[in-house]
């Protein structure tokens, strides 16, 4: 990548929270995709904070889709561009949160990938429904406390493992699937650029820590994102035609306790009886990632 940073096409002045992860994710996505891009953005934090009527922070064509149909709208945009003979000159990128991607909009997204539409989908995974009050999604990690899975006398928080969305999208026959993190801007920009240059449905899954929903200082967003990677709870890799082709190595993984202790959504693990055993379970997830993805 050039030492000169590519131009971004989303402006300041939006109403995102201090330290907003979605602002970073949108910025890096457009730095990778470039100016000749049409964005489809389902309902969520990014849509709400970037387009308060009658204003917009977007400097590229932007479409607000429903929570559930970003994949269908992207399919229609791509088909229309093909019919007009303009698809080779314009990139179609959908940017959605984990709720619209992994839950509410999964059916439409699956259909778009199964049909082979030529577009890139970027999931900004802040691991809960932040826009509506920090409710659990299928992207919420094990033992995280949310407003619908609160930690208490009978629960350590979310009882279910995080859905493996990259594997699901790879199973659709996608030519390119990658994970990344807003804590590594160059990595995210490079992967988005690569994804948008490949013909066919491509998928980027980016972790995007939310200070409001996760409970950490607003100045620590990128630091927390890096810590997720350094503890191996967020492996970064690329898959081409279903095969892992590149992995970001972690030479000296840090204990997951450092990552968990930095967030209020996991604070109960350090105060409740039995919390130590739960931390060991989360460490086992990181250890599995190290072995499965060959992170060392």
Curated annotation (Swiss-Prot):
<keyword id="KW-0560">Oxidoreductase</keyword>
<dbReference type="InterPro" id="IPR011766">
    <property type="entry name" value="TPP_enzyme_TPP-bd"/>
</dbReference>
<dbReference type="Pfam" id="PF02775">
    <property type="entry name" value="TPP_enzyme_C"/>
</dbReference>
<keyword id="KW-0411">Iron-sulfur</keyword>
<protein>
    <recommendedName>
        <fullName>Pyruvate synthase subunit PorB</fullName>
        <ecNumber>1.2.7.1</ecNumber>
    </recommendedName>
</protein>
<feature type="compositionally biased region" description="Polar residues">
    <location>
        <begin position="140"/>
        <end position="150"/>
    </location>
</feature>
<comment type="subunit">
    <text>Heterotetramer of one alpha, one beta, one delta and one gamma chain.</text>
</comment>
<dbReference type="InterPro" id="IPR029061">
    <property type="entry name" value="THDP-binding"/>
</dbReference>
<feature type="binding site">
    <location>
        <position position="17"/>
    </location>
    <ligand>
        <name>[4Fe-4S] cluster</name>
    </ligand>
</feature>
<feature type="binding site">
    <location>
        <position position="20"/>
    </location>
    <ligand>
        <name>[4Fe-4S] cluster</name>
    </ligand>
</feature>
<feature type="region of interest" description="Disordered">
    <location>
        <begin position="140"/>
        <end position="159"/>
    </location>
</feature>
<dbReference type="InterPro" id="IPR051479">
    <property type="entry name" value="PorB-like"/>
</dbReference>
<feature type="binding site">
    <location>
        <position position="45"/>
    </location>
    <ligand>
        <name>[4Fe-4S] cluster</name>
    </ligand>
</feature>
<dbReference type="GO" id="GO:0019164">
    <property type="term" value="F:pyruvate synthase activity"/>
</dbReference>
<dbReference type="GO" id="GO:0046872">
    <property type="term" value="F:metal ion binding"/>
</dbReference>
<feature type="binding site">
    <location>
        <position position="210"/>
    </location>
    <ligand>
        <name>[4Fe-4S] cluster</name>
    </ligand>
</feature>
<keyword id="KW-0408">Iron</keyword>
<keyword id="KW-0479">Metal-binding</keyword>
<keyword id="KW-0004">4Fe-4S</keyword>
<dbReference type="GO" id="GO:0051539">
    <property type="term" value="F:4 iron, 4 sulfur cluster binding"/>
</dbReference>
<dbReference type="GO" id="GO:0030976">
    <property type="term" value="F:thiamine pyrophosphate binding"/>
</dbReference>
């Amino acid at each position: 990548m050039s030492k000169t940073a590519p131009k971004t096409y989303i402006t300041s002045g939006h109403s995102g929270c201090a330290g907003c992860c979605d602002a970073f994710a949108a910025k890096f996505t457009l730095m990778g995709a470039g100016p000749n891009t049409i964005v489809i953005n389902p309902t969520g934090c990014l849509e709400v904070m970037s387009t308060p009527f009658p204003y917009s922070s977007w400097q590229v064509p932007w479409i607000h889709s429903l929570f559930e149909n970003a994949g269908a709208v992207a399919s229609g945009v791509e088909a229309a561009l093909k019919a007009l003979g303009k698809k080779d000159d314009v990139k179609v990128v959908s940017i959605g949160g984990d709720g619209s991607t992994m839950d509410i909009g999964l059916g439409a997204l699956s259909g778009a990938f199964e049909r082979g539409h030529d577009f890139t989908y970027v999931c900004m995974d802040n691991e809960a429904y932040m826009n509506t009050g920090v409710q659990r999604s299928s992207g919420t990690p094990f033992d995280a406390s949310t407003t619908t899975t609160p930690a208490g006398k009978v629960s350590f928080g979310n009882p279910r493992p995080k859905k493996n969305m990259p594997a699901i999208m790879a199973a659709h026959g996608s030519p390119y699937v990658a994970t990344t993190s807003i804590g590594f801007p160059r990595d995210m920009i490079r992967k988005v650029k690569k994804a948008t240059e490949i013909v066919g449905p491509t998928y980027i899954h980016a972790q995007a820590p939310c200070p409001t929903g996760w409970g950490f200082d607003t100045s620590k967003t990128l630091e927390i994102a890096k810590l997720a990677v350094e503890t191996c709870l967020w492996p970064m890799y690329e898959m081409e035609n279903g095969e892992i082709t590149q992995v970001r190595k972690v030479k000296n993984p840090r204990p997951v306790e450092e990552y968990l202790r930095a967030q209020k959504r996991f604070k109960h693990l350090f105060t409740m009886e039995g919390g130590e055993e739960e931390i060991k379970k989360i460490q086992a997830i990181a250890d599995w990632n190290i072995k499965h993805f060959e992170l060392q």
